[in-house]
Curated annotation (Swiss-Prot):
Organism encoding this protein: Aplysia fasciata (Mottled sea hare)
Keyword field: Cleavage on pair of basic residues, Neuropeptide, Pyrrolidone carboxylic acid, Secreted
GO (cellular component) term, any one: extracellular region
Tissue: Neurons R3-R14. A cluster of 12 giant neurons located on the right side of the abdominal ganglion.
Keyword Zinc-finger on entry: no
Biological process, per Gene Ontology: neuropeptide signaling pathway
Job of this protein: HRBP is a myoactive peptide that excites Aplysia heart and enhances gut motility in vitro.
Name of this chain's protein: Abdominal ganglion neuropeptide R3-14
Compartments, record wording: Secreted
The organism's taxonomic lineage, starting at the top: Eukaryota, Metazoa, Spiralia, Lophotrochozoa, Mollusca
Record-listed Pyrrolidone carboxylic acid modification sites: Q43
Protein backbone atom coordinates (compact mmCIF):
# COMPACT_ATOMS: atom_id res chain seq x y z
CA UNK A 1 0.00 0.00 0.00
CA UNK A 2 1.07 3.61 -0.53
CA UNK A 3 2.02 5.58 2.58
CA UNK A 4 1.05 9.23 2.18
CA UNK A 5 4.06 11.43 2.75
CA UNK A 6 2.97 14.90 3.82
CA UNK A 7 6.40 16.43 4.30
CA UNK A 8 6.45 17.89 0.80
CA UNK A 9 2.97 19.35 1.34
CA UNK A 10 4.19 21.04 4.50
CA UNK A 11 7.22 22.40 2.67
CA UNK A 12 5.00 23.81 -0.06
CA UNK A 13 2.80 25.50 2.51
CA UNK A 14 5.80 26.92 4.34
CA UNK A 15 7.30 28.28 1.14
CA UNK A 16 4.01 29.87 0.12
CA UNK A 17 3.56 31.49 3.51
CA UNK A 18 7.12 32.78 3.55
CA UNK A 19 6.75 34.35 0.10
CA UNK A 20 3.50 36.04 1.15
CA UNK A 21 5.06 37.36 4.34
CA UNK A 22 8.17 38.73 2.63
CA UNK A 23 5.92 40.34 0.03
CA UNK A 24 3.93 42.06 2.79
CA UNK A 25 7.10 43.14 4.55
CA UNK A 26 8.51 44.68 1.37
CA UNK A 27 5.31 46.62 0.78
CA UNK A 28 5.26 47.86 4.37
CA UNK A 29 8.90 48.94 4.45
CA UNK A 30 8.34 51.04 1.35
CA UNK A 31 6.79 53.57 3.72
CA UNK A 32 8.10 54.13 7.22
CA UNK A 33 7.46 51.06 9.40
CA UNK A 34 4.63 52.36 11.57
CA UNK A 35 3.02 54.45 8.84
CA UNK A 36 0.22 51.95 8.35
CA UNK A 37 -1.05 52.09 11.94
CA UNK A 38 -0.76 55.85 12.24
CA UNK A 39 -2.62 56.33 8.97
CA UNK A 40 -5.32 53.95 10.16
CA UNK A 41 -5.71 55.77 13.47
CA UNK A 42 -5.87 59.13 11.70
CA UNK A 43 -8.62 57.87 9.39
CA UNK A 44 -10.62 56.43 12.27
CA UNK A 45 -10.29 59.66 14.25
CA UNK A 46 -11.42 61.75 11.31
CA UNK A 47 -14.36 59.41 10.81
CA UNK A 48 -15.51 59.99 14.41
CA UNK A 49 -15.06 63.75 14.07
CA UNK A 50 -17.09 63.93 10.86
CA UNK A 51 -19.80 61.72 12.31
CA UNK A 52 -20.15 64.08 15.26
CA UNK A 53 -20.19 67.14 13.00
CA UNK A 54 -22.83 65.69 10.70
CA UNK A 55 -24.91 64.56 13.67
CA UNK A 56 -24.91 68.07 15.13
CA UNK A 57 -25.73 69.57 11.76
CA UNK A 58 -28.70 67.32 11.06
CA UNK A 59 -30.16 67.15 14.56
CA UNK A 60 -30.27 70.78 15.51
CA UNK A 61 -32.10 71.30 18.76
CA UNK A 62 -35.06 73.63 18.76
CA UNK A 63 -38.83 73.67 18.56
CA UNK A 64 -38.79 71.21 15.70
CA UNK A 65 -41.24 68.39 15.39
CA UNK A 66 -38.84 65.72 16.67
CA UNK A 67 -36.80 67.78 19.11
CA UNK A 68 -38.66 66.17 22.02
CA UNK A 69 -37.59 62.67 20.97
CA UNK A 70 -34.05 63.74 20.16
CA UNK A 71 -33.60 65.24 23.62
CA UNK A 72 -35.07 62.15 25.26
CA UNK A 73 -32.78 59.85 23.29
CA UNK A 74 -29.74 61.94 24.06
CA UNK A 75 -30.66 61.76 27.74
CA UNK A 76 -31.36 58.04 27.64
CA UNK A 77 -28.32 56.92 25.66
CA UNK A 78 -25.96 59.52 27.07
CA UNK A 79 -24.59 60.72 23.75
CA UNK A 80 -21.63 59.05 22.08
CA UNK A 81 -18.66 59.60 24.35
CA UNK A 82 -15.44 58.71 22.57
CA UNK A 83 -12.68 57.15 24.60
CA UNK A 84 -9.13 57.28 23.30
CA UNK A 85 -8.38 53.59 23.67
Amino acid sequence: EEVFDDTDVGDELTNALESVLTDLKDKRDAEEPSAFMTRLRRQVAQMHIWRAVNHDRHHSTGSGRHSRFLTRNRYRYGGGHLSDA
